Design a protein with these regions (language model features):
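Hydrophobic "anchor" residues on beta-strands that sit immediately upstream
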Residues: 3, 52-54, 118, 144-145
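Histidine/acidic-residue-rich, glycine-tolerant segments that coordinate divalent metal ions
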Residues: 93-105, 109-149
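Hydrophobic/aromatic beta-strand patches that form the interior of the parallel beta-sheet core
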Residues: 41-43, 55, 88, 118
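Active-site-proximal flexible loops/turns
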Residues: 15, 63-67, 129
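Histidine-rich, glycine-flanked metal-binding segment
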Residues: 1-3, 8-53
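Structured loop/turn residues at beta-strand edges in well-structured enzyme cores
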Residues: 4, 37, 82, 115, ...
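Divalent metal-coordination and catalytic microenvironments
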Residues: 9, 24, 47, 58, ...
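Metal-associated gating/positioning segment near the N- to mid-region
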Residues: 48-110
Length: 149
């Protein structure tokens, strides 16, 4: 079990605190300079802001179909490097995100990445603007929104 002590970190409300993190979970929070627990790693965080994780509502993972541009694994790694823990991926893939099978492909490929990927389903089949997708089936499969972007 790894323990990290962040000293004098500022939260989103501007409050300076010490944080004890055990196995990636905040175990304790105390006023800045007061937490004296032993830790494997001590990080002086004065001037730094701590967030539980950011959510990027508009990403183009391009997987399936355009993995030469981006794929779920590289997109997730880039997100984590920037403190982003959740992303909503746009449906302009090939095939487009207009079937439950494509939604499941994305969710399965994203599962081991450490990033929660929220697929956005198409409004219309193939993003062609001709016929509406089966929204109930897409929602049951796990989409978080719809778009023809």
């Amino acid at each position: 079990m790894q323990t990290i002590l962040l000293q004098h970190a500022t939260d989103a409300y501007g409050i300076s605190s010490d944080f004890l993190i055990q196995d990636g979970i905040i175990a304790k929070r105390a006023p800045a300079g007061t937490l004296q627990d032993a830790a494997d790693v001590v990080i002086p965080a004065k001037g730094l802001t701590i967030f539980p994780g950011l959510f990027d509502m508009h990403v183009h993972l391009r997987d399936p179909g355009f993995t030469q541009k981006e794929d779920i694994l590289t997109g997730a790694a880039a997100a984590l490097a920037g403190g982003v823990t959740d992303v909503a991926c746009m449906p302009n893939t090939k095939p487009t995100i207009d079937t439950p099978e494509t939604v499941q492909y994305i969710l399965d490929k994203a599962a081991p990445t450490g990033v929660k990927v929220h697929p956005i389903g198409c409004i219309t089949n193939g993003m062609k603007g001709e016929s509406l997708c089966d929204y109930p089936a897409l929602m049951q499969a796990g989409i978080c929104a719809i778009s023809d972007d």
